[in-house]
């Protein structure tokens, strides 16, 4: 009993030391967003956590106590998370975080290769826990009572029925929006797993490229990611991630590395690098499978699936603007606690009514929707968010960021220097209704949306929807949106405004006798067939069958000699024979025309009529 108490006290002391160390490192930069998390600190904290972590495959969550006792011999375990990967069978994994990276490295170094498999032996933070008795002698273990798992099946997404039940039990729309956000956003375990995937890529090339960095960006780190979202990675061989380093800050040296000269075409060089790196991922990295190289895209990427993390990963080497855009969105999300819940609700609404689609195409994307939300929050009488132009004007010399392509991504990283304070006190339900009302009246036909200026601009081209790219201002992030989809968006926001306004006036309305009440957001999240207005009546299908066109032409060719008849069904045998003879004569004349090269066949009946 006394040993258990001493062990618990030791764990508590280590945890207190760990927290003090991490909090001190985050507070080391004075004057940087006091009281508000900084993006660089957020990234750095999770990178350190990844360096202190390992992922071990186990038979079930019941193996945790045995795994804890075994792995405690390498260092102090600060926390453990359990998650499942559901494929043909359910696979169980436990993520262990040590107090230091050296302890995690000791656990990884104690691993052995699987002699039963013929794969290339690779050292990585992904291991599996085999049954006792096999392999080399286990270290001497001290029986300890393992602390409870911090999460059990921690990556399981909430199902639709359970989510609707939570929303139905909420007191009002405000609580519904918060419930939706809390139960669908990317949780802490999901973020940790994504940084582990990045660390695996970085460590794979650390021998040849010690300054290389693989950093997550996009929805995984900007605070707007949902459970199950893909991971976007950028791999850079330099450590500054595009930042300008003053020459006077560099330490002079007379020793210079020999390097390989690149091709004159930078894009071709990047494609060759990525092709080579894709082969390495496919052949050597544990867990990486289904590698696809998409090198001809505007931003060349490598897509792959990580089977131990159940992640879809997009790896690029030249998307620095996407990296800095993630930082900008993270700052917007941290400025006001209403920004992210409002964005999640609007994204969910768009998904429910079919405005967004998982596949790329003519539909509006989640990023474009997020830009619409940010622009709306800039347009309020009492704005909740500042303009990007104001952030750029408040930038200091240390905030300078310029990509290799010369794109200026400079804006202040210290929001407190901006002096922006929002006095807007609107509730989430009020903001949601105002969003729908704002875009139901917005002139998409003539006006463009600019987060940099914070006001509508004249459209520079005839795109159905024009949203100025916040960092590459010559580009339109919604260029893919078709005219039909833009009109659908206007109709759907009008529907939503009408439904939500009715819901505000009537707290809840029964759907029918014997049915549960459907109120608040549930009315917005109804299936499309229950919506008030559908835009399908305004647009005809644009897909046609080519064979039908030829049948119509052939049927129309007989209109001069016979009454109009269907192209396929013939009620008279003589008519069928006449049509067949006309087809045969036409084919013969076409052959003669191709053979002689003349422009008009002389035997054509139409020509004989003209000569008369």
Curated annotation (Swiss-Prot):
Subcellular localization, as worded in the UniProt entry: Mitochondrion
UniProt keyword Mitochondrion present: yes
Protein name as it appears in the record: Poly(A) RNA polymerase, mitochondrial
Encoding gene per record: MTPAP
GO cellular component: mitochondrion
Residues involved in ATP binding: 83-89, 228-229
Domain of life according to the entry: Eukaryota
Disruption phenotype: Mutant male larvae die at the third instar larval stage with a severe reduction in polyadenylation and increased mitochondrial tRNA levels except for tRNA(Cys) which shows a marked reduction and an accumulation of shortened RNAs. Mutant male larvae show de novo translation of some peptides, suggesting that polyadenylation is not required for translation. They also show reduced assembly and activity of respiratory chain complexes I and V. Heterozygous females are viable and fertile as the gene is X-linked.
Every PAP-associated domain range: 427-463
Transit peptide feature, positions: 1-57
Residues where Mg(2+) binds: 230, 232
EC numbers, comma separated: 2.7.7.19
Annotated spans, Disordered: 555-574, 588-612
């Amino acid at each position: 009993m006394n040993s258990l108490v001493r062990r618990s006290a030791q764990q508590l002391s280590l945890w207190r030391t760990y927290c003090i160390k991490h909090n001190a490192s985050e507070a080391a930069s004075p004057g940087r967003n006091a009281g508000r998390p900084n993006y660089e600190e957020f990234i750095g904290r999770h990178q350190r956590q990844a360096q202190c972590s390992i992922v071990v495959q186990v038979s079930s969550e019941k193996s945790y106590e045995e795994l804890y006792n075994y792995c405690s011999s390498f260092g102090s375990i600060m926390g453990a998370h359990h998650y499942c990967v559901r494929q043909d069978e359910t696979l169980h994994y436990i993520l262990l975080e040590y107090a230091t990276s050296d302890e995690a490295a000791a656990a990884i170094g104690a691993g052995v290769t699987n002699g039963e498999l013929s794969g290339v032996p690779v050292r990585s933070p992904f291991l599996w826990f085999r049954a006792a008795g096999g392999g080399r002698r286990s270290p001497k273990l001290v029986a300890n009572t393992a602390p409870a798992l911090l999460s059990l099946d921690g990556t399981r997404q909430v199902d639709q029925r359970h989510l609707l039940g939570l929303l139905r039990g909420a007191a009002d729309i405000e609580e519904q929006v918060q419930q939706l956000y809390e139960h669908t956003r990317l949780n802490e375990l999901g973020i940790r797993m994504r940084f582990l995937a990045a660390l695996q890529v970085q460590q794979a090339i650390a021998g040849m490229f010690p300054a290389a960095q693989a950093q997550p960006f996009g929805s995984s780190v900007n605070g707007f990611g949902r459970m199950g979202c893909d991971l976007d990675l950028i791999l850079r061989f330099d450590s500054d991630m595009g930042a300008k380093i003053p020459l006077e800050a560099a330490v002079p040296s007379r020793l210079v590395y020999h390097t390989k000269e690149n091709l004159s075409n930078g894009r071709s060089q990047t494609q060759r690098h990525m092709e080579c790196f894709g082969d390495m991922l496919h052949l050597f990295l544990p867990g990486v499978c289904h590698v696809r190289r998409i090198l001809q895209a505007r931003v060349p990427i490598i897509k792959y699936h990580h089977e131990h993390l159940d992640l879809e990963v997009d790896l690029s080497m030249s998307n620095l603007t996407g990296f800095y855009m993630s930082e900008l969105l993270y700052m917007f999300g941290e400025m006001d606690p209403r920004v992210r819940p409002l964005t999640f609700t609007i994204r969910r609404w768009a998904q429910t009514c079919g405005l967004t689609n998982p596949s790329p195409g003519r539909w509006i994307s989640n990023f474009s929707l997020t830009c619409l939300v940010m622009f709306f929050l800039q347009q309020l009488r009492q704005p909740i968010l500042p303009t990007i132009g104001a952030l750029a004007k408040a930038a200091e010399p240390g905030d300078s960021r310029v990509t290799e392509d010369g794109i200026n991504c400079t804006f202040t990283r210290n929001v407190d220097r901006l002096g922006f304070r929002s006095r807007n006190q609107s509730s989430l339900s009020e903001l949601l209704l105002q969003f729908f009302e704002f875009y139901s009246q917005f002139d998409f036909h003539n006006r463009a949306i600019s987060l940099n200026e914070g006001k509508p601009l004249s459209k520079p081209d005839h795109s159905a929807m024009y949203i100025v790219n916040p960092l590459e201002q010559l580009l339109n992030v919604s260029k893919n949106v078709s005219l039909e989809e833009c009109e659908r968006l206007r109709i759907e926001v009008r529907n939503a405004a009408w439904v939500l306004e009715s819901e505000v006036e009537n707290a809840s309305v029964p759907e029918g006798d014997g049915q549960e009440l459907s109120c608040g957001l549930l009315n917005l999240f109804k299936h499309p067939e229950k919506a008030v207005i559908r835009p399908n009546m305004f647009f005809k299908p644009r897909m046609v069958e080519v064979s039908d066109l030829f049948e119509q032409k052939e049927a129309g060719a007989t209109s001069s000699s016979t009454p109009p008849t269907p192209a396929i069904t013939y009620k008279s045998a003589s008519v069928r024979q006449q049509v067949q003879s006309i087809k045969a004569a036409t084919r013969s004349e076409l052959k003669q025309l191709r053979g002689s090269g003349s422009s008009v066949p002389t035997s054509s009946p139409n020509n004989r009529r003209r000569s008369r």
